[in-house]
Curated annotation (Swiss-Prot):
Class of this enzyme: oxidoreductase
Protein name from the UniProt record: Uncharacterized oxidoreductase C24B10.20
GO process annotations (BP): cellular detoxification of aldehyde
Homology family: Belongs to the short-chain dehydrogenases/reductases (SDR) family.
Subcellular location per the Swiss-Prot or TrEMBL entry: Cytoplasm; Nucleus
Entry-linked Pfam families: adh_short
GO molecular function: oxidoreductase activity
Top-rank taxon, per record: Eukaryota
Primary location class: cytoplasm
Length: 254
């Protein structure tokens, strides 16, 4: 059973930015238990402080690039609950700001390992807990950078490609689990003022100054992003399985 008959969430990448905002909003809801992952829990100071005043928040160690780490994290969760209802993979990196011609193998591989294999590792490790849950929801935080029809003439190379691969993976999983009552979706979180966003804007500013200023002026807070995405996830239905959603709840093309 889920914890005390309530809803159990696993938020992967719950130690900062959007993930931390998800943890905070969810943990303020009655009957919700949240497992928040961090690659290095010892340095996740804000998450640790939050958990001290919210007994329904449990911190787990998880490095998504390692299947062994993902399985260990699932074992940590299983010591507390017998199933989970929502698995939300929010972790990711964006460090690729050069054209394809100049992007190194290391960058291609690191983005694929974290943004694609990472979510796969987590799904494989937590599947047995999800299939016993009530909701059976899997959510992947994706990006509009994955949309082929919406690609801008800027240099997201490895990042955009990895998010497109993530969306393909989401769609494949949605087909595989449909008969078992799962609802699997990807969501674009919006342009969010996180550490990753600030770094990206700094890298792109010299080449695309006008575009960067426009993007920065429209950026929203992690709290706004988390709240809007939760409105989507809180209302997921069977027919939403396999969909890619924008922050406002509209469907996005792949």
């Amino acid at each position: 059973m889920s914890a005390a008959g309530g809803i159990v969430y696993v938020i992967v990448g719950g130690n900062r930015g959007i993930g931390l905002s998800l943890v905070k909003e969810l943990s303020n809801k009655e009957g919700v238990t949240v497992f928040a992952s961090a690659r290095g829990p010892g340095s996740a100071s804000e998450l640790k402080d939050w958990s001290k005043t919210h007994s329904n928040v449990h911190i787990i160690k998880l490095d998504v690039t390692s299947l062994r780490s993902a399985k260990d994290a699932a074992m940590q969760v299983e010591k507390v609950v017998k199933c989970i209802d929502v698995l939300w993979v929010n972790s990711g990196i964006s460090k690729s700001f050069q054209p394809v011609l100049k992007t190194s193998d290391e960058l291609w591989m690191s983005h694929y390992q974290t943004n694609v294999l990472g979510p796969i590792h987590v799904y494989q490790a937590f599947y047995h807990l999800l299939k016993e849950g009530k909701l059976k929801n899997i959510v992947f935080t994706s990006s509009m950078a994955a949309c082929m029809g919406g690609v801008r003439p800027n240099t997201y190379s490895a990042y955009g490609q990895s998010k497109a691969a993530l969306n393909y993976t989401m769609k494949e999983i949605s087909f595989e689990l449909e008969k078992d009552g799962f609802v699997v979706v990807s969501i674009h979180p919006g342009v969010v003022n996180t550490d990753m966003f600030v770094n990206a804007m700094q890298k792109l500013a010299s080449k695309y100054p006008e575009m960067v200023e426009s993007i920065k002026s429209n950026a929203i807070s992690p709290e706004q992003s988390a709240s809007s995405m939760l409105k989507i996830v809180d209302n997921l239905k069977t027919e939403d399985n396999g969909m890619f959603y924008n922050l406002d709840g509209t469907k996005l093309p792949f």
